[in-house]
């Protein structure tokens, strides 16, 4: 069969998680390639990027079902860099998910489901 070995879907070496390439076709745009991720992370990052008013375009794609990576394209206004927008989106997501976890734990405490 032509499928890659199963371990390739999760084994990642040092420095291989993300690569950033400038998009030469569009001004103020970058392509972020994130290895060993899928639609779950791509969709949530894209949604967070689109909340930023200085982001003109944000989209993602999975090149092929057997390739375990996503490519996120970000275009911003002239006074804002795509890398800055991406970093801000990730930071905001981390804080939102931390708040969600905190609220979830608070709700479960009366039920004594958590230690």
Swiss-Prot record:
UniProt keywords, alphabetically: DNA-directed RNA polymerase, Nucleus, Transcription
Residue stretches in coiled coil: none
A GO molecular-function descriptor: DNA binding
Domain of life from the UniProt record: Eukaryota
SUPFAM superfamilies attached to this UniProt entry: RBP11-like subunits of RNA polymerase
Entry GO terms, CC: RNA polymerase II, core complex
Pfam families the UniProt entry points to: RNA_pol_L_2
Coarse class of the protein's main subcellular location: nucleus
PROSITE patterns, alphabetized: RNA_POL_L_13KD
Signal sequence bounds: none
GO biological process: transcription by RNA polymerase II
UniProt KW Isomerase keyword: no
Tissues where the protein occurs: Ubiquitously expressed.
Subcellular location as annotated: Nucleus
The family this protein is said to belong to: Belongs to the archaeal Rpo11/eukaryotic RPB11/RPC19 RNA polymerase subunit family.
Functional summary from the UniProt entry: DNA-dependent RNA polymerase catalyzes the transcription of DNA into RNA using the four ribonucleoside triphosphates as substrates. Component of RNA polymerase II which synthesizes mRNA precursors and many functional non-coding RNAs. Pol II is the central component of the basal RNA polymerase II transcription machinery. It is composed of mobile elements that move relative to each other. RPB11 is part of the core element with the central large cleft.
Quaternary assembly: Component of the RNA polymerase II (Pol II) complex consisting of 12 subunits.
Full protein name: DNA-directed RNA polymerase II subunit RPB11-b1
Native organism: Homo sapiens (Human)
Gene (name only): POLR2J2
């Amino acid at each position: 069969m032509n499928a890659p070995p199963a371990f390739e879907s999760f084994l990642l070496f040092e420095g291989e998680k993300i690569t950033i390439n400038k998009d030469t076709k569009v001004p103020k745009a970058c392509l972020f390639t994130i290895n060993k991720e899928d639609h779950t992370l791509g969709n949530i990052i894209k949604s967070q990027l689109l909340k930023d008013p200085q982001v003109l375009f944000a989209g993602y794609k999975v090149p092929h079902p057997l390739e375990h990576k996503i490519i996120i394209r970000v275009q911003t206004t002239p006074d804002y860099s795509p890398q800055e927008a991406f970093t801000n989106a990730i930071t905001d997501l981390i804080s939102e998910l931390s708040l969600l976890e905190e609220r979830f734990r608070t709700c479960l405490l009366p039920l004594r489901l958590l230690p």
